[in-house]
């Protein structure tokens, strides 16, 4: 059964799925994803469409552009949270960001941060909240730019809107909610002043034409977030992503990954600056 497949034995099933998708003139590389992630996506869509067998679902994909788009969208990494890894954000807030800001006190250049898979925007907005709070305490004007990218236009649209339910704000204090959000019923909207230093754009980390988001012009990031993304891909693709984001860092820049992805960075020439923080620098 495909739903318990080993890629070596079920490559044919993946190729059949790819062929069904391509009937709509859409190309997608299913082989770059970790097989368990593809299985999970297929299983979810089969449940949603009440397909009992794999060939039945493939037939639906071949006939329905809507379902094809839904399946492809299910491959987009869309889950995120505000302040998702508390230890990571605590180290950034208490140590790394204040240090970087102090170094730039007498400089005209801005602090540059890249959120490389921003989903609905929780990650870049979390960073902006910290930056605004630090600068407010220091009585300094904002001098930073956050480049927030995602390969999904749907996710970027949602991030730019900045609308969240009460349940999505669980990791935020009431003070932060009242200061940075406008509330209407159970919906909360990011205030315009928090968006002013964030640049949202669609960007594919596998795009060979660009080494960093075109909107950033030249890369040169002090911090790059590549968190909770790598484990969705196979080793070869992980290496490509790490090389791209690593090359976009300034000297002694920081690469931030998810809690479960720390060992991946260690095996690719990075060292963790604080234990279990998920914050790395190049060796």
Functional labels for PLM-detected ranges:
Residues 2-114, 258:
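Conserved AdoMet
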Residues 108-121, 145-147:
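Conserved class I S-adenosyl-L-methionine
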Residues 116, 137-138, 142-225, 229-237, ...:
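Extended basic-aromatic, gly/pro-enriched interface segments that bind polyanionic ligands
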Residues 120-138:
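Conserved SAM-binding loop of SAM-dependent methyltransferases across substrates and taxa
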Residues 223, 265-283:
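Core SAM-dependent methyltransferase catalytic element
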Residues 239-251:
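A short glycine-rich, Lys/Arg-flanked "PGG" loop and its adjoining helix->strand segment in the class I
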Residues 251-259:
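Conserved beta-strand signature within the Rossmann-like core of class I S-adenosyl-L-methionine
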């Amino acid at each position: 059964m495909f739903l318990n497949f080993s890629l070596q034995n079920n490559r044919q099933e993946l190729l059949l799925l790819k062929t069904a998708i391509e009937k709509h003139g859409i190309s997608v590389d299913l082989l770059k994803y970790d097989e368990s992630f593809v299985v999970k996506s297929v299983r979810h869509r089969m449940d949603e469409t009440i397909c009992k067998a794999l060939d039945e679902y493939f037939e639906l994909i071949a006939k329905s552009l809507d379902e094809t788009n839904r399946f492809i969208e299910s491959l987009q990494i869309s889950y995120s949270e505000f302040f998702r890894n508390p230890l990571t954000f605590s180290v950034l807030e208490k140590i790394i960001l204040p240090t970087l800001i102090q170094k730039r006190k007498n400089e005209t250049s801005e602090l540059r941060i890249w959120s490389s898979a921003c989903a609905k925007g929780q990650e870049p907005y979390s960073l902006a909240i910290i930056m605004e709070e630090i600068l407010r305490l220091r009585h300094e004007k904002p001098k930073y730019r956050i480049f927030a990218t995602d390969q999904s236009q749907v996710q970027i649209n949602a991030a730019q809107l900045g609308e969240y339910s009460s349940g999505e704000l669980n990791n935020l204090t009431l003070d932060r909610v009242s200061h940075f959000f406008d509330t209407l019923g159970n919906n909360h909207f990011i205030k315009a002043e928090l968006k002013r230093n964030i640049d949202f754009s669609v960007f594919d980390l596998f795009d060979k034409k660009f080494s960093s988001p075109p909107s950033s012009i030249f890369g040169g990031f002090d911090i790059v977030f590549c968190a909770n993304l790598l484990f969705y891909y196979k080793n070869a693709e992980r290496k490509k992503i790490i090389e791209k984001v690593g090359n976009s860092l300034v000297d002694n820049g920081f690469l931030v990954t998810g809690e479960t992805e720390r060992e991946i960075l260690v095996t690719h020439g990075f060292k963790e600056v604080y234990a279990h923080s998920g914050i790395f620098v190049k060796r």
